[in-house]
Amino acid sequence: MPIEEQTRNSGNRRFVRSSRALAGEFLCLIALVALMGSVGTPYAEAQTDRKPPSRAAKPELPKEKQTTLGLYVTAKEAYEKWKAAPKKATVLDVRTPEEVLFVGHAAMAWNVPLFLQTYVWDAERGKFPMKPNPDFISQVKKIAKPGDTLLVMCRSGGRSAMAVNQLAEAGFKRVFNITDGMEGDLVDDPDSVYRGQRMKNGWKNSGLPWTYAPTPDRMMLPKIR
């Protein structure tokens, strides 16, 4: 056989062997990818099956300000949320009518008191106690539906948390607690001249719009019994 033909045949055999080797490597790669995919699937499924953490608990908040729905905003965040879509969000002030009139209120807010002020002095507790408003839920339902967004405030976030929980039990799903309320938290710095006063945060201290002017068309006043 001529030398040139021997060389050509030898080259062809090397090409065939090389092609077979590449094909074998490609098949091994496919098998490896498939194996990795099958091993990863249970992990992915486990990740998918994991339940998201509960939003109800917010460790940095005092327990009395936490709610079952776990939806929280500051006064400033609540105002921005309302301002962005005033027809889709309702600001709900659950303080007493007396607080609304004498302390001031956000003009866009509806006043539906969670508690009503009494005028019988409790000597043991050292205050005029409040009593629950029996019409609270029915009054809220006159201005909002269970699917509406409600931004709930009181003086400093405690009563509003209670209101959120009651509304949640009544079927409302998007109810946010305004955690610093209208007046804010007490200053606890022993060196501050404002110690013991509500000068820390809250709607008024955040520079948000408020007024003393009554808005009786937005107040659910208690029935005289």
State where each predicted segment sits.
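N-terminal secretory signal peptides that target proteins for export/translocation
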Residues: 1-21
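Bacterial N-terminal signal peptides
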Residues: 24-38
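Short hydrophobic beta-strand that contains or immediately precedes a catalytic carboxylate
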Residues: 90-95
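Conserved G/P- and acidic residue-centered "switch" motifs that form tight phosphate/ATP-binding loops
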Residues: 157
